[in-house]
């Protein structure tokens, strides 16, 4: 059994270069998660299970003042280099499908990406949080759950 809760997309910066979770698009995040899943599958027993706890985010709620690494597609926080660097923000630009204030759907995008890569999507479990972290939003309800996927 493997149980993990990877860094959620665009929600935390742990201060490590090349860290997972600071990809410039949801698609790049899912692509990297699928690559991680391939490595997990390689070391998991044939009858083993993979439990994935993952939360969501909203388009437009990403980091500001970051630089896009053109080679890796990752966001680099706290860049102290040239002021000519392209200033980008995760979830603040335009997207073909996702609009400002849309829930990005990272949990399901991730689960379906892993399924497309050969994992069996066995179950989705709602982790209900009776005392969630308060949010300062006025146009939607406070998020009070995360997903756990059994793969």
Language-model features: locations:
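Core catalytic lobe of class I
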Residues: 1-151
């Amino acid at each position: 059994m493997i149980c993990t809760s990877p860094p959620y997309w665009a929600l935390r910066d742990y201060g490590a270069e090349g860290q997972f979770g600071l990809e410039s698009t949801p698609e790049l995040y899912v692509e990297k998660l699928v690559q991680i899943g391939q490595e997990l599958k390689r070391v998991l027993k044939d009858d083993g299970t993979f439990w994935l706890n993952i939360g969501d985010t909203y388009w437009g709620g990403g980091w500001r003042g970051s630089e896009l690494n053109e080679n890796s597609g990752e966001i680099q926080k706290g860049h102290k280099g040239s002021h000519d660097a392209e200033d980008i923000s995760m979830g603040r630009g335009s997207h073909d499908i996702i609009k400002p204030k849309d829930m990005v759907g990272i949990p399901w995008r991730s689960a379906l990406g892993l399924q497309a890569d050969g994992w069996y999507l066995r179950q989705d479990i709602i982790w209900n949080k009776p005392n969630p972290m308060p949010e300062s939003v006025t146009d939607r309800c406070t998020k009070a759950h995360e997903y756990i996927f059994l793969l």
